[in-house]
């Protein structure tokens, strides 16, 4: 089954994506704690706004990083993990 790139990701209520100077990186805050995101996840997370679909996020990052193979696959994998961990909804 293929991933539907027309879905629009949004952070779940209670989850907040932000830059945390003490962590020297982006984090995802939620009521039970915090997750420090790696650079790739931070770039993707910064584009999750509840308006852009996954295709738009892929297009944006492919333009920022031309010639980087598998950008789309990496974004799909992030979306699957984030949904599985209940960080985001996909509608």
UniProtKB/Swiss-Prot annotation:
Query: Its biological function?
Result: Functions as a PqqA binding protein and presents PqqA to PqqE, in the pyrroloquinoline quinone (PQQ) biosynthetic pathway.
Membrane keyword on record: no
Q: Which InterPro entries match?
A: PQQD, PqqD_bac, PqqD_sf
Q: What is this protein's record name?
A: PqqA binding protein
Keywords from UniProt, A to Z, are: PQQ biosynthesis
Q: How does it assemble?
A: Monomer. Interacts with PqqE.
> In the UniProt record, does the keyword Transferase occur?
no
């Amino acid at each position: 089954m293929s991933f539907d790139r027309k879905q629009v990701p949004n952070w779940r209520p209670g989850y907040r994506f932000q830059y945390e100077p003490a962590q020297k990186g982006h984090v995802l805050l939620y009521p039970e704690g915090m997750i420090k995101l790696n650079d790739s996840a931070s770039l993707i997370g910064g584009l999750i706004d509840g308006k852009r679909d996954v295709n738009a996020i892929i297009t944006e990052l492919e333009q920022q990083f031309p010639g980087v193979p598998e950008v789309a696959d990496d974004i799909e994998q992030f979306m699957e993990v984030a949904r599985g961990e209940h960080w985001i909804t996909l509608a």
